[in-house]
Amino acid sequence: MQGTMRLWVSVLTFALSLLICLGTLAEAYPSKPDSPGEDAPAEDMARYYSALRHYINLITRQRYGKRSSPETLISDLLLRESTENIPRSRFEDPSMW
């Protein structure tokens, strides 16, 4: 009797902690703004489009850190458009000659 009771308490504790973790993950992601409808006034549509633009910027922003792989860093260095930050050789400088 006590063994089954202990099993049920542990299963209930696990299920509750799993629900808490899933709830925390769901709150961390921004929710899409609600559409005001087709016949909404211009002010409501402007607010909706502003909120939608903010939402899209949040979910598509670039992430740095552990997600940056060495391959992407190398390709960024090789395919860089500006050459002002690339170190030059000593022999390319005319003052050396």
UniProtKB/Swiss-Prot annotation:
Q: Where is the signal peptide?
A: 1-28
Keywords for this protein: Amidation, Cleavage on pair of basic residues, Cytoplasmic vesicle, Neuropeptide, Secreted, Signal
Picking any one GO molecular function of the record gives: neuropeptide hormone activity
**Where is the protein situated, by its record's location annotation?**
Secreted; Cytoplasmic vesicle, Secretory vesicle, Neuronal dense core vesicle
Q: Which GO terms describe its cellular component?
A: extracellular space; neuronal dense core vesicle
Q: Name one Pfam family in it.
A: Hormone_3
* GO annotation terms (biological process): feeding behavior; neuropeptide signaling pathway
* Statement: the UniProt record of this protein carries the keyword Ligase: no
Q: Which domain of life is it from?
A: Eukaryota
Q: Which residues carry this modification: Tyrosine amide?
A: 64
The similarity annotation says: Belongs to the NPY family.
Q: What does this protein do?
A: NPY is implicated in the control of feeding and in secretion of gonadotrophin-release hormone.
Q: What is this protein called?
A: Pro-neuropeptide Y
The coding gene here is NPY
